[in-house]
């Protein structure tokens, strides 16, 4: 019989992202404090574009977006954004949704498993995910608890537990 294993991934449901952006756009259209600010939120691929006529309004739109992400169960660790940039008469803020585990983060996770994990547990980097194998399921459970206690700045999900 094959050794027990599980995969560590960092994926965000695209439908939930779409729903959160649509809810944000709807709230922006109906809220009184966003009237006549030209505020909008649009999704295109892996990025979300937030637009408003002042720097503060763009940050307020970002707050609404983050609130909707939390309500839909999406980790804010999956979002990356910088400061709003002026563009003509409006300010734009691009928010990127990160999918998958970056190579440097994957190496840090594998190193943590080797250093602090139970003996006999191995982690292999497979593209944008990690496969963790071990002799006993109890060891794999300990690895999951170890990784949940750490902050790797990406949302981690544990799938394909066999």
UniProtKB/Swiss-Prot annotation:
It holds the Pfam family DUF520. CDD domains: YajQ_like. SUPFAM superfamilies: YajQ-like (SSF89963). InterPro entries: DUF520, UPF0234-like_C, UPF0234_N, YajQ-like_sf. One of its GO terms (cellular component) is cytosol. Belongs to the YajQ family. This is Nucleotide-binding protein FRAAL1054. The lineage of its organism: Bacteria, Bacillati, Actinomycetota, Actinomycetes, Frankiales.
């Amino acid at each position: 019989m094959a050794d027990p294993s599980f995969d560590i991934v960092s994926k965000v449901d695209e439908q939930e992202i779409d729903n959160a952006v649509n809810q944000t756009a709807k709230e922006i259209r109906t809220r009184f404090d966003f009237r006549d600010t030209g505020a909008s939120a649009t999704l295109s691929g892996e990025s979300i574009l937030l637009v408003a006529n002042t720097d503060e309004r763009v940050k307020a739109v970002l707050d609404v977006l983050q609130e909707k992400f939390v309500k839909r169960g999406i980790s804010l660790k999956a979002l990356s954004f910088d400061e709003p940039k002026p563009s003509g008469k409006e300010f734009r803020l691009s928010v990127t949704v990160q999918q998958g585990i970056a190579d440097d983060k994957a190496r840090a996770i594998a190193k943590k498993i080797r250093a602090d994990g139970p003996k006999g547990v191995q982690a292999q980097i497979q593209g944008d995910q990690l496969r963790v194998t071990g002799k006993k399921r109890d060891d794999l459970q300990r690895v999951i608890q170890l990784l949940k206690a750490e902050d790797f700045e990406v949302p981690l999900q544990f799938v394909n537990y066999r």
